[in-house]
């Protein structure tokens, strides 16, 4: 029910939410409360879901897009939860809003789609409400929404790759890192994060060590990544054996390096340039028309 017809004449604020890509992910421990400690090299692309926010007479949320049917549109959705969080955290500024999310990314796919959406809400409302709250402070508070939300908020604010430690709260900006041309591939199987972590047999792997100088060029980064891991790949592979086929498809299309992101099932390939990535995406989509295939360029310094 539309309670304020004038709202449609107010210009909406919108953004494309971050795609989060764990180029390396080491699980180095586990806290007493069960949270796993990680060290991760994380790159981003602002080409995820499309989120818009319009001041409205009452709160409303509409979910559309090719992957909308796989999500709930009620109070459990991270867009709604993030709005509730902002209203409760800044009650003196809280205002009702109409959010529309066009779900363009696969669900439960290891690229932080839900966390990116939550970060998008925080970023839009921080601007609309003219909050006197730094990105760093808001990121610290937003950890209650999920471990990936703070880093996604940093991606929207600073548009740079990050080195992330702890449960996701210890964030270092990588200001000298180069941009990457990549292809994302998802074969369609959802993989629950909790299921992958539960299947992880070893929780105290060696830490992630990578020289910041290696991040300056594609070739040096690819070489450095050979000495890193995604410690969640082995348990994810037991759940989704087709991950091996996805990685083979990326390698056969000319990827310089390929790996699963996060807990899966999305895998990425790094290519020498944007043209090579676009050609590879066309090749993979032709071979596997039912797969999600997306060429992207990651955020980095200008």
Swiss-Prot record:
One Pfam family named in its UniProt record: GHMP_kinases_N
Catalytic residue list: 20, 148
Pathway(s): Isoprenoid biosynthesis; isopentenyl diphosphate biosynthesis via DXP pathway; isopentenyl diphosphate from 1-deoxy-D-xylulose 5-phosphate: step 3/6
Keyword Kinase belongs to the record: yes
Catalytic class of the enzyme: transferase
Sections of the chain in a coiled coil: none
Catalytic reactions on record: 4-CDP-2-C-methyl-D-erythritol + ATP = 4-CDP-2-C-methyl-D-erythritol 2-phosphate + ADP + H(+)
Full protein name: 4-diphosphocytidyl-2-C-methyl-D-erythritol kinase
Encoding gene (name): ispE
């Amino acid at each position: 029910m539309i309670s304020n017809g004038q709202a449609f004449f107010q210009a909406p604020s919108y953004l494309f939410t971050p795609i989060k890509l764990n180029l390396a992910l080491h699980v180095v421990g586990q806290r007493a409360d069960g949270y796993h400690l990680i060290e991760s090299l994380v790159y981003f692309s602002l080409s995820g879901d499309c989120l818009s926010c319009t001041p409205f007479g009452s709160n409303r949320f509409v979910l559309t897009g090719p992957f909308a049917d796989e999500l709930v549109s009620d109070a459990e959705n991270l867009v709604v939860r993030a709005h509730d969080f902002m209203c409760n955290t800044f009650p003196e500024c809280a205002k009702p809003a109409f959010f529309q999310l066009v779900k363009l990314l696969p669900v439960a796919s290891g690229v932080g789609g839900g966390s990116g959406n939550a970060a998008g809400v925080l970023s839009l409302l921080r601007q609309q409400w003219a909050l006197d709250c730094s990105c760093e402070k808001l990121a610290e508070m937003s950890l209650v929404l999920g471990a990936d939300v703070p880093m996604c908020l940093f991606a929207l604010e600073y548009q740079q790759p990050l080195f992330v430690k702890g449960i996701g709260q210890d964030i270092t900006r990588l200001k000298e890192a180069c941009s990457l041309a990549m292809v994302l591939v998802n074969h369609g199987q959802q993989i629950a994060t909790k299921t992958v972590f539960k299947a992880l047999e070893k929780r105290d792997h060696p830490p992630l060590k990578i020289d910041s100088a290696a991040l300056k060029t594609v070739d040096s980064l690819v070489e450095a990544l050979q000495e890193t891991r995604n410690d969640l790949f082995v348990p994810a592979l037991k759940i989704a054996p087709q991950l091996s086929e996805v990685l083979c498809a990326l390698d056969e299309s000319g990827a310089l390096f390929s790996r699963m992101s996060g807990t899966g099932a999305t895998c990425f390939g790094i290519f020498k340039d944007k043209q090579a990535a676009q050609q590879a995406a066309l090749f993979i989509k032709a071979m596997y028309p039912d797969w999600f295939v997306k060429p992207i360029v990651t955020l980095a310094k200008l």
